[in-house]
Amino acid sequence: MAHPHLLAERISRLSSSLEKGLYERSHAIRLCLLAALSGESVFLLGPPGIAKSLIARRLKFAFQNARAFEYLMTRFSTPEEVFGPLSIQALKDEGRYERLTSGYLPEAEIVFLDEIWKAGPAILNTLLTAINERQFRNGALVEKIPMRLLVAASNELPEADSSLEALYDRMLIRLWLDKVQDKANFRSMLTSQQDENDNPVPASLQITDEEYERWQKEIGEITLPDHVFELIFMLRQQLDKLPDAPYVSDRRWKKAIRLLQASAFFSGRSAVAPVDLILLKDCLWYDAQSLNLIQQQIDVLMTGHAWQQQGMLTRLGAIVQRHLQLQQQQSDKTALTVIRLGGIFSRRQQYQLPVNVTASTLTLLLQKPLKLHDMEVVHISFERSALEQWLSKGGEIRGKLNGIGFAQKLNLEVDSAQHLVVRDVSLQGSTLALPGSLAEGLPGEIKQQLEELESDWRKQHALFSEQQKCLFIPGDWLGRIEASLQDVGAQIRQAQQC
């Protein structure tokens, strides 16, 4: 792949030119461009009058000398209107069944078919062959067709269990469009004087036939790394477990992988990256319900697994647990001993905290974990003022279990050694101890493990920062991934400060 970053820059500039004058259609243009560059088909779902046909018309200008064909289907449409009329002369003089295809679908690089589901069986069957094999049977001859992009559109989905499902399955990219939402964009659209049918693309950016053919071969050379395949397989397994998940054919998975390869290729990379998998959200859904489900599952994959976020959090949890164990091993030395007040004949014994315990919030470790309020508890956080009042006056005492959530009611007492003991429902007790002094710092074992974890986090964040330069991925998805990584980083740094 020659000068990959220059190619990525060129495709970005080409897309920007195609997007001019089209408001809130950047994502649709970019994915249609990606489909055209990889020879795939697109289905646009949405109400009339939202620029579906204009999107397809624009894509013609991405290529030098590209021919376009567009047609509005009705129940009465005939194959002649789509694939060309029969040659009366050939039929009369030579008895040959031959269509005159000039100006029709078989000789167009960019094809737009509106209200696609109204097409009859004769059109659908020929269209399936054209999409699958890029061939058209014209009489006795089988002709290769130059179609690079088929954009089909409708304001409805095909009926389930209908003859249309085979064609719908060939539409790899599926986009749900709506009218312009933003107020400023709506105003700009109303007042724009730009001729929507003018060519907005400079000749220097247009793609030649030679470039297109060469790129098709080079797209196939983009590798699929093992860790990316594992993410894809994880998504597939998760979808198989969900009762409401759409059926995704092996053919659709295979075609989707080529789309991911194209995304990597035109982003200047030699291998598919986890960020490319976000494109699957526009490939795997079938209807409105499955659209939301697919997006949710891919969101979980991207924010939890694609850059090892969940794995790093699991490692962090184990390190924190080990740190607490080490602290508990030292807890006998730091068991909290309260000070007894008053005489031995007082009606109720009163206590106070040692003078060296001054923090407004006290985190006390359990010498052995207890199950309190259905939670395995290793430490409890108390408000100093609440604990002092309980030591002085008795009554109810509450603390945050493991330092999280709301403060819970506790069974707390002072034993004969003047240590605080917390008990569970079976009255098993655990002595509360102060954590090691801050001056001691983190144990060497814990410090090293946290440093290694932080190093791994930096590597994953650097990988994401490098891979996120992808024209075809919406910015809001990238923002959520960045937030998930930053959250992991913040938790690691917090643990290092303990």
UniProtKB/Swiss-Prot annotation:
Q: Which gene encodes it?
A: ravA
Per the record, the major location class is cytoplasm
The name this protein goes by in its record? Regulatory ATPase RavA
Its lineage reads: Bacteria, Pseudomonadati, Pseudomonadota, Gammaproteobacteria, Enterobacterales
Taken from the UniProt record, the cysteine pairs bridged by disulfide bonds within this chain are none
Q: Member of which family?
A: Belongs to the RavA family.
Q: Can you state which reaction this protein catalyses?
A: ATP + H2O = ADP + phosphate + H(+)
Q: How is its activity regulated?
A: ATPase activity is stimulated by ViaA.
- Which enzyme type, at the first EC level? hydrolase
Q: Which GO terms describe its molecular function?
A: ATP binding; ATP hydrolysis activity
**SMART domains assigned:** AAA (SM00382)
What EC number(s) does its UniProt record assign?
Answer: 3.6.1.-
Q: Which keywords appear in this protein's UniProt record, sorted alphabetically?
A: ATP-binding, Chaperone, Cytoplasm, Hydrolase, Nucleotide-binding
The record's InterPro entries line, in alphabetical order, gives:
AAA+_ATPase, ATPase_RavA, ATPase_RavA_C, MoxR, P-loop_NTPase, RavA-like_AAA_lid, RavA_ATPases, RavA_LARA_dom
Q: Tell me yes or no: is Oxidoreductase among this UniProt entry's keywords.
A: no
Q: What is the role of this chain?
A: Component of the RavA-ViaA chaperone complex, which may act on the membrane to optimize the function of some of the respiratory chains. RavA functions as an ATPase.
- Gene Ontology CC terms: cytoplasm
Matching entries from PANTHER family are given as: ATPASE RAVA
